[in-house]
């Protein structure tokens, strides 16, 4: 596909989303009276751009989940048959919290994701972590199910949802790189994320894989959306409509009305509602 065709495809997809997918920004049961524009109304998110998860990111996730009292569910669907992603995550969390505080979950289909007994660990958890891999595998099983609603309930009681790589993109309302054919298709056959970030598309590995410009055309065609690209070993910690950058590299923020993206580094804060850097002394 040449660049002009790609741009037209993105523009048409954006218009379709704006006119036909209002539900992209909503939870499984209709959300009304939202107090935030993009971020979660309650609870917090830790959205990681892939690669090695550095200690300061783990520290923030565990602190937000309750410290030594945290109860974590690790959802491994994105990894498919590959053990590397989820084994390393489970090992790290068990080392920090103990094996009894960490529950792996890999539900096989929508039927299982609607089974109250199988999703019970989410209802008791203080934190959820999505491993990397392919984000459509998460959407295909959990979207608009009782498990999905249980994730919203976790946020409502002040919990935290984290994820790396595919586990980052799934947290947006638009599922970026969600095609089953491969991650080079930006908007594909799975378009809806879990929506913890409303009117948002999230990309990952942006500098390592030279993806920092990929969100631009979509955001220009869909001005109500914001695009967030996160590099490896870097995360954003989201509370309401504010996020803080954590880690060793950069975050790119795309929104309508700017010539290019804004780059943020560790410690910098961004107002998602006003779409501007928060100045700190």
Language model segments and positions:
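ATP/NTP phosphate-donor binding region
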Residues: 62, 70-120
């Amino acid at each position: 596909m040449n660049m002009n065709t790609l741009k037209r495809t993105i523009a048409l997809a954006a218009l379709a989303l704006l006119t036909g997918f209002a539900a992209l920004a909503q939870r499984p049961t209709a959300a009304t009276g939202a107090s935030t524009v993009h971020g979660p109304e309650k609870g917090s998110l830790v959205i990681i751009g892939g690669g090695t998860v550095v200690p300061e990111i783990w520290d923030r996730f565990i602190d937000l989940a309750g410290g030594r009292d945290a109860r974590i569910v690790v959802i491994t669907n994105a990894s498919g048959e590959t053990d590397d992603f989820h084994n390393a995550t489970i090992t790290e969390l068990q080392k920090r919290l103990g094996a009894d505080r960490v529950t792996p979950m890999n539900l096989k289909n929508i039927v299982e994701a609607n089974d109250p007994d199988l999703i019970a660990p989410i209802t008791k958890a203080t934190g959820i972590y999505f491993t990397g891999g392919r984000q459509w595998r998460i959407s295909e099983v959990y979207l608009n199910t009782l498990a999905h609603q249980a994730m919203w309930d976790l946020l409502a009681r002040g919990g935290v949802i984290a994820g790396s790589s595919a586990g980052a993109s799934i947290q947006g309302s638009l599922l970026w790189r969600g095609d089953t054919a491969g991650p080079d298709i930006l908007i594909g056959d799975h378009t809806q994320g879990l929506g913890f970030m409303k009117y948002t598309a999230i990309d990952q590995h942006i500098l390592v894989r030279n993806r920092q410009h990929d969100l631009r055309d979509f955001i220009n065609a869909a001005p109500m959306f914001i695009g967030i690209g996160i590099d490896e070993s870097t995360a954003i910690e989201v509370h309401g409509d504010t996020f803080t950058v954590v880690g060793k590299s950069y975050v790119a923020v795309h929104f309508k009305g700017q010539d290019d993206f804004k780059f943020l580094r560790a410690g910098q804060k961004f107002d998602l509602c006003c779409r501007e850097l928060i100045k700190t002394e």
